[in-house]
Amino acid sequence: MSTLYDNIGGQPAIEQVVDELHKRIATDSLLAPIFAGTDMAKQRNHLVAFLGQIFEGPKQYGGRPMDKTHAGLNLQQPHFDAIAKHLGEAMAVRGVSAEDTKAALDRVTNMKGAILNK
């Protein structure tokens, strides 16, 4: 039985999705300020590993727990919604099916409490 990670296209596809997501974040007036001063290469590596893991890929994420990573950022529902929107669009642009995109966004939504540090 294939996993969501496999259906999406594995590591190369997740890397492409994250690259597309970062382009969208950089031009989003709500999100771009949150990432000002962030080492985006390091953030990319963490996000690729995190998404790969929650999409049933290899356990790669070795960063701090999400709530600790996001502590002090004052992330709110509009931030989460914007990231989710951009992630869904990035997946569509990279050819991920609507069904797999929905499954991926459901998994990200399951992490919302930790992402928003709530």
UniProtKB/Swiss-Prot annotation:
Heme binds at H70. Binds 1 heme group per subunit. Disulfide bonds: none annotated. It is a peripheral membrane protein. Its cofactor is heme. The keyword Heme applies. Keywords: Heme, Iron, Membrane, Metal-binding, Oxygen transport, Transport. One of its GO terms (molecular function) is oxygen carrier activity. Its main location: membrane. InterPro entries: Globin-like_sf, Globin/Proto, Globin_bac-like_CS, Hemoglobin_trunc, Hemoglobin_trunc_I. Pfam families: Bac_globin. Belongs to the truncated hemoglobin family. Group I subfamily. Monomer. This is Group 1 truncated hemoglobin GlbN. It comes from Nostoc sp. (strain MUN 8820). The lineage of its organism: Bacteria, Bacillati, Cyanobacteriota, Cyanophyceae, Nostocales.
